[in-house]
Amino acid sequence: MECGGALQLPPGFRFHPTDDELVMYYLCRKCGGLPLAAPVIAEVDLYKFNPWDLPERAMGGEKEWYFFSPRDRKYPNGQRPNRAAGTGYWKATGADKPVGSPRAVAIKKALVFYAGKPPKGVKTNWIMHEYRLADVDRSAAARKLSKSSHNALRLDDWVLCRIYNKKGVIERYDTVDAGEDVKPAAAAAAAKGGRIGGGGGAAAMKVELSDYGFYDQEPESEMLCFDRSGSADRDSMPRLHTDSSGSEHVLSPSPSPDDFPGGGDHDYAESQPSGGCGGWPGVDWAAVGDDGFVIDSSLFELPSPAAFSRAAGDGAAFGDMFTYLQKPF
């Protein structure tokens, strides 16, 4: 199929090439001035946009998008690329990976997008894999020779990029003023009927999800959260949430003063194993604290030698031990 024509594929087909296929059949042909088999990769200057604005500029894709982009240099006569993009910047992470065997044809670099201005940018979930040709002379002398040939952009200045979000959704991070603080788009939240929760700082930053609106950070699994009302409302019980599969936490109604010795109005939570029977035998309910938890003082007492004598029938075996424990150190 001629490059530039309409791409017609049956339903169910996805563009999901490997690293070697991206380099051999797309990057090398692009840098060699050869046409591609199908127009599946758009030419976009990635450093003019935020990553969440790129999916709509791609030829296609659902959770990852591919682009040919020119290499923008930080300095006119240098080789260091300019990583500023949109309202943030891309930052390299990890080591470069050679692509091709036995000889590397290209270099794969992983980058993470930070919203805001360095060095206070907020790390996002947007990832870019940049593929560039290996063993290419990008020195100032080579570029000067290229300009003398009236080439505004050398073919080997093209890079192939894969963009995706680790969460599989389109997250938007909006900045205010000079990009010092990164905040969600409140106007977009109001338009979508989303919600913005409390909290501050980068760790609690809310983001806009194109599929799910706004979200707050959810508690991690294995966390217990008691949502208890005020002390004035003694009839309302604390709500217990748990992800643990080892036991079931059952909320019981407040016992009446006639049910337990000592009387009083106490809230309590009863924990019983799965498939087992409830009840804590031997618990002094009069010792229940105001916070709703049972404190059995007998659990913290040191057994006396007499108790061991009754258990073992002869306390002589434990006499020396208790004599030693009672000595000051």
Swiss-Prot record:
This protein's GO CC annotations: nucleus
Annotated region described as Disordered, given as residue ranges: 228-281
One GO biological process term: positive regulation of response to salt stress
Superkingdom as given in the UniProt entry: Eukaryota
Matching Pfam families: NAM
A GO MF label: DNA binding
Alphabetical keyword list: Activator, DNA-binding, Nucleus, Stress response, Transcription, Transcription regulation
Presence of keyword Transcription: yes
Swiss-Prot/TrEMBL induction comment: Induced by dehydration, salt stress, cold stress, abscisic acid (ABA) and methyl jasmonate.
Tissues/organs with expression: Expressed in roots and embryo. Weakly expressed in callus.
Annotated NAC domain residues: 9-166
Name by which UniProt lists this protein: NAC domain-containing protein 71
Phylogenetic lineage: Eukaryota, Viridiplantae, Streptophyta, Embryophyta, Tracheophyta
Name of the gene: NAC071
